[in-house]
Design a protein with these regions (language model features):
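C-terminal non-catalytic scaffold/interaction domains in large multidomain proteins
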Residues: 1-187
Length: 187
């Protein structure tokens, strides 16, 4: 069954919403018309095998499910730019809306590369020396002109730190800018 396959894959929980979505077509001709009814039926059928939480069932009573952590960990493991839909499909054992929310709200870890595409900040390759060079140019330009535009900064990076662009060749210019903004936010 889908429940057994999910649990055997190393997951210790199964969300009712995910089960309902997975079996929606099979449930059309049954009294199970919504997630709530499915939950009630599962509690009856698996009463002695599982613990039942509000949103999921598990064999471990003390489990704490953190969907943000699941999404962030997946993105880090993938080590590439991924679309929101790709992540939803890969994490089909989690509720779709929750995955989409986690994908879009963790903007300091999952960096926007283009519309609907993100990567994990750890994928961005930049050395401390490169960051210090960027900080220096920002500070000196602001000191001299009271402002530095993103285009000016990116031109400087292209001319003086081409290895930063080369090391992150699969990340768009927007993604590089956003990653730098996150890394330099506290400096």
């Amino acid at each position: 069954s889908f429940i057994d396959a999910t649990l055997e894959s190393g997951k210790v929980f199964v969300f009712y919403e995910t089960l309902f979505s997975h079996f929606k077509d099979e449930l059309l001709d049954t009294p199970v018309a919504n997630v709530s009814m499915l939950c009630t039926w599962l509690q009856y059928k698996y009463e002695k095998e599982f613990y039942f939480d509000k949103e999921y069932m598990t064999r471990d009573r003390y489990i704490d499910i953190d969907i943000d952590h699941e999404v962030i960990s997946y993105m880090r493991e993938q080590w590439q730019v991924k679309s929101e839909d790709e992540v939803v499909k890969a994490l089909d054992y989690l509720p779709e809306d929750s995955v989409r929310t986690a994908f879009n709200r963790n903007t300091n870890v999952l960096i926007a590369a283009t519309r609907g595409m993100r990567f994990h900040i750890d994928k961005f390759e930049v050395s401390e020396e490169e960051l210090n060079d960027i900080i220096f140019i920002i500070e000196t330009t602001i000191e001299k002109f009271q402002f530095i535009g993103a285009d000016e900064l990116f031109d400087y990076i292209h001319q003086n730190l081409p290895q930063l662009i080369n090391n992150n060749s699969d990340i768009s210019e927007l993604g590089i800018r956003k990653a730098l903004a996150v890394l330099l936010a506290d400096k």
